[in-house]
Curated annotation (Swiss-Prot):
<keyword id="KW-0689">Ribosomal protein</keyword>
<comment type="subunit">
    <text>Part of the 50S ribosomal subunit. Forms a bridge to the 30S subunit in the 70S ribosome.</text>
</comment>
<dbReference type="GO" id="GO:0002181">
    <property type="term" value="P:cytoplasmic translation"/>
</dbReference>
<dbReference type="InterPro" id="IPR022666">
    <property type="entry name" value="Ribosomal_uL2_RNA-bd_dom"/>
</dbReference>
<keyword id="KW-0694">RNA-binding</keyword>
<dbReference type="InterPro" id="IPR014726">
    <property type="entry name" value="Ribosomal_uL2_dom3"/>
</dbReference>
<comment type="similarity">
    <text>Belongs to the universal ribosomal protein uL2 family.</text>
</comment>
<dbReference type="GO" id="GO:0015934">
    <property type="term" value="C:large ribosomal subunit"/>
</dbReference>
<dbReference type="Pfam" id="PF03947">
    <property type="entry name" value="Ribosomal_L2_C"/>
</dbReference>
<dbReference type="GO" id="GO:0019843">
    <property type="term" value="F:rRNA binding"/>
</dbReference>
<dbReference type="InterPro" id="IPR012340">
    <property type="entry name" value="NA-bd_OB-fold"/>
</dbReference>
<protein>
    <recommendedName>
        <fullName>Large ribosomal subunit protein uL2</fullName>
    </recommendedName>
</protein>
<dbReference type="InterPro" id="IPR014722">
    <property type="entry name" value="Rib_uL2_dom2"/>
</dbReference>
<feature type="region of interest" description="Disordered">
    <location>
        <begin position="213"/>
        <end position="276"/>
    </location>
</feature>
<dbReference type="InterPro" id="IPR022669">
    <property type="entry name" value="Ribosomal_uL2_C"/>
</dbReference>
<keyword id="KW-0687">Ribonucleoprotein</keyword>
<dbReference type="InterPro" id="IPR005880">
    <property type="entry name" value="Ribosomal_uL2_bac/org-type"/>
</dbReference>
Length: 276
């Protein structure tokens, strides 16, 4: 997918880039697969901010995505490739032979007219086909990966995301994630063959603050620009440093300090990500 630039008729657009929409088919979305979800803007049910630097952003409807891929043995044809405002990859509308329509994450190389399917085993290794991990050959690139059988995909769902199946042992398979982490996943979990499309998303330059506001991202004030009452880094004369290791507004170490809590699934991680 090509990166496009813009004429600099304002300074903010000079370095702004975007993605071309040549792969998107000009058809309206399926209304039965659209649902309205109120924007929380980072607030909880009490109206208090629980996640800072968020706002509602541009109005949008949620597209119901099939993350489980449980229509075994029923082939589906790609009807359209669509833009999804809720994620950074494209989605594909699949029209199944029994008349049902569903959206899926579009893998790279999947085009209008292609036929895909889901099964426990026995399918061709081509982008868009979904099988259980135990039935996928070692070395295959996969995405849309379940962590618990039947729960739906939780890993490798964003633009350019993937994992590589490195080996199999008893009831687990070994996956290598893009971070370099080697992890065991239950062999009964479903995964889809291929890489998530729209890989060039990582090369897009936002260019101006307004585009982040459309996405629901608010400005982030530096702690050193605040007063001591507001942040541990605040205060001082001029641009004086805080004199301590970086911390959050609540005094917890940040910028490199490990904050992940230990949990039962840690035993499934064979090796941590690169450089850790």
């Amino acid at each position: 997918m090509a990166i496009k630039s813009f004429k600099p008729y304002t300074p903010s657009r000079r370095f702004m880039t975007g993605l071309s929409s040549e792969d998107i088919t000009a058809k309206p979305s399926v209304r039965s697969l659209l649902v309205k979800i109120p924007a929380t803007a980072g607030r909880n049910h009490n109206g208090r901010i629980t996640s800072r630097h968020k706002e509602a952003g541009a109005k949008k409807l949620y597209r119901i995505i099939d993350f489980k891929r449980k229509k075994f043995g029923i082939p589906g044809k790609v009807e359209t490739i669509e833009y999804d405002p809720n994620r950074n990859c494209r989605i594909a509308l699949i029209s199944y032979s029994d008349g049902e329509k569903r959206y899926i994450i579009r893998p790279s190389g999947l085009n209008v007219g292609d036929v895909i399917s889901s099964a426990e085993s026995g399918l061709d290794i081509k982008p868009g086909n979904a099988m259980k991990l135990k039935s996928i050959p070692v070395g295959t690139i996969v995405h849309n990966i379940e962590l618990k059988p039947g729960k739906g995909a939780q890993m490798a769902r964003s633009a350019g995301g993937y994992a590589q199946l490195m080996g199999k042992e008893e009831k687990y398979v070994i996956l290598r994630l893009p971070s370099g982490e080697m992890r065991q996943v239950l062999a009964e979990c479903m995964a889809t063959v291929g890489v998530v499309g729209n890989e060039d998303w990582a090369n897009v330059t936002i260019g101006k603050a307004g585009r982040n506001r459309y996405r629901g991202i608010r400005p982030q004030t530096r702690g050193s620009a605040m007063n001591p009452v507001d942040h541990p880094h605040g205060g001082g004369e001029g641009k004086k440093n805080s004199g301590r290791h970086p911390v959050t507004p609540w005094g917890k170490p940040t910028k490199g300090a490990k904050t992940r809590r230990k949990k039962a699934s840690d035993r499934l991680i064979i090796s941590r990500r690169k450089g850790k």
